[in-house]
Amino acid sequence: SYGYDEKGGVSVPGPMGPSGPRGLPGPPGPGPQGFQGPPGEPGEPGSGPMGPRGPPGPPGKNGDDGEAGKPGRPGERGPPGPQGARGLPGTAGLPGMKGHRGFSGLDGAKGDAGPAGPKGEPGSPGENGAPGQMGPRGLPGERGRPGASGPAGARGNDGATGAAGPPGPTGPAGPPGFPGAVGAKGEAGPQGARGSEGPQGVRGEPGPPGPAGAAGPAGNPGADGQPGAKGANGAPGIAGAPGFPGARGPSGPQGPSGPPGPKGNSGEPGAPGSKGDTGAKGEPGPTGIQGPPGPAGEEGKRGARGEPGPTGLPGPPGERGGPGSRGFPGADGVAGPKGPAGERGSPGPAGPKGSPGEAGRPGEAGLPGAKGLTGSPGSPGPDGKTGPPGPAGQDGRPGPPGPPGARGQAGVMGFPGPKGAAGEPGKAGERGVPGPPGAVGPAGKDGEAGAQGPPGPAGPAGERGEQGPAGPGFQGLPGPAGPPGEAGKPGEQGVPGDLGAPGPSGARGERGFPGERGVQGPPGPAGPRGNGSQGAPGLQGMPGERGAAGLPGPKGDRGDAGPKGADGAPGKDGVRGLTGPIGPPGPAGAPGDKGESGPSGPAGPTGARGAPGDRGEPGPPGPAGFAGPPGADGQPGAKGEPGDAGAKGDAGPPGPAGPTGPPGPIGNVGAPGPKGARGSAGPPGATGFPGAAGRVGPPGPSGNAGPPGPPGPVGKEGGKGPRGETGPAGRPGEVGPPGPPGPGEKGSPGADGPAGAPGTPGPQGISGQRGVVGLPGQRGERGFPGLPGPSGEPGKQGPSGSSGERGPPGPMGPPGLAGPPGESGREGAPGAEGSPGRDGSPGPKGDRGETGPGPPGAPGAPGAPGPVGPAGKNGDRGETGPAGPAGPAGPAGARGPAGPQGPRGDKGETGEQGDRGIKGHRGFSGLQGPAGPPGSPGEQGPSGASGPAGPRGPPGSAGSPGKDGLNGLPGPIGPPGPRGRTGDAGPVGPPGPPGPPG
């Protein structure tokens, strides 16, 4: 978007500043250590579409030929930019559930490719050539070699090769190494005097290429970084028009990488042991003192620039490796106390300067800038004094006026007359009082661009001024709050770290009542990492006797995840839960990979042209840039469209016809008058409210050519470049319009005089002066870019590469943010019927009953139903006694005490298994802990072999031809050429008619 400056003018956005260094990774959080799941099958390498062609570089000049003047020396090479700092580690996913399956073999980590060198210095701009037609599409570049692999891990057994799966997700880019030491900037040599230009000689043959300089030793490989989260696909950019290939700049040196950290000890897999209590958390150790930086390495000699090699074809994708065998399950270790943090080591000495990397491909063409505002016209200066009049000629005899004749042909240009003396310059008038500001007039038409003047002498580079005060604008009102964002996706499962040493086993206390959930405290400092070894598993005890059935205990801890049961019948869909409150913002994620370029969006509507603003103050001249190497010859441009015809002026009133006077002598040219005083600037307008961000409009018309900038300093003398290829011949120019007729009316024909004597041949005429170069016409509009051609067919798949070796497991990442509570699951199907239990032991033998009727006891209270006892043996039947008389009914007695509980009966048969209970709600995930300390970087493995180059795809169809480009601006007027040789004398003309008699 465009802003408004203090004077109400539209400010064009400046170029984007350089990216700041990336911060160091934060420490990992103290979250629980998750177990690693089985590794996914490796995806096939994707073959993404080739990005759009970069913007054209500026056309270079032809090298000096023959005995030409000395070329300027090339500018000094700037110091290499610092290497970016290591990126933040990506956030790890939620810890996985502890399973009974063993750890699977890890795939070897792919080494990071070395960082690309800094972009070379831009080439010096060549002469403005006309834009050429679009060239054929170049061959795809050679596929880069893969980076060094990680250290060789224990290789699992090769499994059977599975079917080719879909391509896997793109892995995150590893963090760049630590920045290398910046080399000292060499002192600039003295500026040599510019030699006089000699005559243009015959173009010489290109000399043999110089010997290549010794390449500096390569820097240490960068450490493998933490995997970062994949970034979202960027918005589709506007495809730039294809341009000419720019000159390849020198590559910067590669900075040294940090030393690899030590590899942690791996625990021996053992049998599952009992889970011990968690040890106490250790106090963090003191921070070590940072050591002094090491000395800077020597700068290698720069070798001669070699000829570019042919572009290779992309190699075939590698074959997908088979899955590794699963390892033995490891025992659940007990988390031990964390040791103190180690001291920070002093940085090592800077490595030797690496060999320069290849230059990166040019970026996409940026959007054309907005058309500049038309400046206010300057006030006309006062007229100069008129020179003294020349001597009046003698009046001729006026002839009879003849009829107006037809327009004659343009006569031969006569010899130029002598230049008159310059008139005296007039005195500058006094500056008048500034008048009131006038009303804003309508926007004037764009004036024609003037011819470019000759470059002035190089001025000294000015010092940078102090930063000006802040403008009088006020801060905009805050916008409305946006809608809440979507919940983040759960992160990927982290890699398991090394097992800690077992802590001391404490006595198990009684389980208390569950208390209320307290407020979460601030996260404590991250403790050091334990380094103990795995303990031996304990012996399995003998099964104990079965005890009596106890009372139901409190709800136990969540058990380990059991094996997956049979799929239950689908239940009814549950009601969707309420949306929870928005959680606290998580830590800043690592920068993602650059997304693929999307299709070009439709062109937006043409924006309205803004009102012309006040003329701004001229800014100070910027510092002179370094002189770049000469670029390649540009191709001739296409013919531009004819410009619009100018508007016809108003016809003036016809004046009276005056008598035809004799032509007077040529007067002296008056001196130009002084420049008028500059008007005072109007008051600044009020700052408006910030407008809404508009859509990107179509490219506006090209602006007028700006004034030439100050010339840069004379560069160092460079070597003679190779001879460029001869460009195609340009189109012939159009025939210019006929010149205006000469002054004066056509005279009446005179009478024929007598033939005179043949005259002698006249003296040889002098060569005419060089005519003034005419003003350039208005620049035509730029044509629309042609449609892109179809993409070529993909290359055939090459042979598979060798499978990589397994790398060491990386450190565990912090747990992810808490996700929303899940919906209740569907009711599962009833489980299978259980097996019948074992028969219980026989109960004790019952007492033998007494014979005879007992006395009627008081009715006791019903006791608790005891278990069914064993059937007693029948006693001997007693003799029947005489029946007594019936007594009176007594009152109801008091309730007797409960009788003793009978012996425990035999265990009954196992009943049918009950229905499976409804699945409970899923608990809330824990909050994310603070990031833990960065893990030690893994060792970089050897570089894999590059695959063979695939066949070249068929060429794409040619795109539709674009409109004719614009005519380039006229170059500066060159120095006067050598004086031509004297022409040969022409043949003697025929004798003239005789003259009049004397």
Curated annotation (Swiss-Prot):
Residue(s) carrying 4-hydroxyproline: 25, 28, 30, 39, 42, 45, 59, 74, 80, 89, 95, 122, 125, 131, 140, 146, 167, 176, 179, 206, 209, 221, 227, 236, 242, 245, 260, 269, 272, 284, 293, 308, 314, 323, 329, 347, 356, 362, 368, 377, 380, 389, 398, 404, 416, 425, 434, 437, 455, 472, 478, 484, 490, 496, 502, 514, 523, 537, 543, 552, 570, 585, 591, 612, 618, 621, 630, 636, 654, 663, 672, 684, 690, 699, 708, 711, 732, 741, 749, 758, 776, 785, 788, 794, 809, 815, 821, 830, 836, 856, 859, 862, 934, 937, 955, 970, 976, 991, 994, 997
This protein's name: Collagen alpha-1(I) chain
Further comment: These protein fragments were extracted from ancient femur bone collected at Rampart Cave in Arizona.
InterPro entries in the cross-refs: Collagen, Collagen_Structural_Proteins
GO cellular component, one term: extracellular region
Biological role: Type I collagen is a member of group I collagen (fibrillar forming collagen).
Positions of post-translational Phosphoserine modification: S104, S600
Biased composition (Basic and acidic residues): 62-76, 904-918
Source organism per UniProt: Nothrotheriops shastensis
Disordered: annotated segments: 1-998
Glycosylation sites: K98, K919
